[in-house]
Amino acid sequence: MTSSPLAGQHVLVTRPAGQAEGFRTLLEAAGATVTTAPTIRLVPPSDPGVLGRAAARLDEYDWIVVTSVNAVRRLAAAAAEADSMCALATGRLAAVGPATADALRALGVADCLVPPAYRGEALAAEIVAATGAERLSDARILLVQAERARPVLRERLVGAGAGVDVAPAYAVEVNRDVRGALREFIELGLGDWLTFTASSAARAFVQLVGAQTGGALVAAISPVTAATLSGFGLPVHVVAATHSMPGLVDALVASAARPGRLAATHDHA
């Protein structure tokens, strides 16, 4: 295989500003031309005090569950302010995926639970299995996530009998500053791929320019994000088998190696 398997491919990245660089680097290393258009921006949650109060009593929780790198950053800041970094580092941690786990380990967390599939349903199942169904009714769990995140993780844990406190770490809003550039990119048919690494970015994309692709193919990081896109009427051509940014790049590379399979749908005319 060529060392630049995505050469000649123009890829749109919709991740938030300040968080797209790693994904961009991976894509460019594979030979792609990359345009970034952050469809969302991260802002403080409606009540920042919830996370601060939870961070002050981390040692009271049997599990601290974190669902994104962004949530790790904000939890760490709150824990530092509450002088509870030791409780964070020595607590029983669970992360939705390897990037989140790596961010926790960078804070000194010795180990944390990561599910084999990087989604809330799988994480809930792993926590239940690791705790034991008979002991879960006595467990207190702190769930650190985005405001208005998918409720499935909390619902599964509560349904299994756990007591769950949700601490919103940040909120997501549509980044309207990119509407003009994004519309031009789509209307001129400049892209070969539109990539989405979160359902929130997919929803914002549709709010900004509607359910149109400009002839580009659509790639999603996970079945959850793919379902969000499909729900808006956007065709999804690729879903990463491993729900991570490297996994999404791998999926694009694999598709580039089979151009005939997607040629019928990839038409800029």
Model-derived regions, located:
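Signature of uroporphyrinogen-III synthase
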Residues: 1-269
